[in-house]
Amino acid sequence: MKTLVVVLVLFAQSAFALIGESEKQIEARYGHPKKVGKFGRGGEDRTVSYAAHGFAIDVGFVAGISRAEAFYLLDKSPITEDAVKRVLAISANKGQTWESVPPAPNGPPTWHRSDGKVMAISTGQFVNVNGITVVKPE
């Protein structure tokens, strides 16, 4: 497997949100939401849409914390390799890297972040970045 080395610049740290951040932290980075929707248990969880830095970004919040983020190009064109690299770079903390993992047969390109807490999938139209929740059987 190949490790994608992510070069982070200071701009990326200050301008983009990370999985696990609160709604206030993400709004401080992306600006005011363009659209807000509710889902899940009694509508307490939300999907919030932003437009920032060339991307349309849909963020899924569970109990007020970002758990999933989907990045689309604003012009609605297919995601380029360069755009995928940008999303991976902005979805990692300093010192973290992304490792490509073998996709399922005919599956999309997939990566795991070096801390083991986040994965990313590129569908061709968008990049989905998700927190990984491990549920241990009781």
Language model feature labels by segment:
Residues A12-S14:
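N-terminal signal peptide c-region/cleavage motif recognized by signal peptidases
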Residues M1-L8:
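Sec-dependent signal peptide recognition
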Residues F16-L18:
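Boundary of Sec targeting at the N-terminus
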Residues E27-E138:
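A cross-family detector of function-defining hotspots
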